[in-house]
């Protein structure tokens, strides 16, 4: 049980996919201008990342390894992610049309989010079993969502703040992301994996 807690805390805070591994920066910068959009994208990414992580582990363990097709791992994981994203898009469209309109083009772009593919590939490289794989995918998604919501809240405050002209827009956003990354470095001694 302690191993699972350490895996969760380590993935969310210490080895955050956005601030430490620099994966998923496109939606991190693109969807974080409004808090509602960031929360919706975080929820959608959490669902996709967790489900894609589980499906990728199952496909790798039950199909690719027994048939000696491990060279198709990346391609098959991309296909799995695309199917999961399409499923998520259909669910969001039916359950929350307003969120579907807010997310716009970013929902299909989860397919190309390198963090989702990175989680699936890292699960295999780290040798996780099924529960660890599911927890790792969920933890990475929670860390992604946490950072995205925090960043969106900060960007909303910066939008109404008196920022010097050269720093307005993406410049202050990148500085803020760097400061967030430094803040998350404070967790580096918390968990040793």
Curated annotation (Swiss-Prot):
Q: What class of enzyme is it?
A: translocase
- InterPro entries, alphabetized: Ion_transpt_RnfA/RsxA, NqrDE/RnfAE, NqrDE/RnfAE_oxidrdctase
Spans through the membrane:
5-25, 47-67, 72-92, 102-122, 134-154, 171-191
The protein's job, in short, is: Part of a membrane-bound complex that couples electron transfer with translocation of ions across the membrane. Required to maintain the reduced state of SoxR.
Q: How does it assemble?
A: The complex is composed of six subunits: RsxA, RsxB, RsxC, RsxD, RsxE and RsxG.
Q: Which family does it belong to?
A: Belongs to the NqrDE/RnfAE family.
Q: Which HAMAP family match?
A: RsxA_RnfA (MF_00459)
Query: What protein am I looking at?
Result: Ion-translocating oxidoreductase complex subunit A
Q: Look up and give the organism this protein is from.
A: Salmonella arizonae (strain ATCC BAA-731 / CDC346-86 / RSK2980)
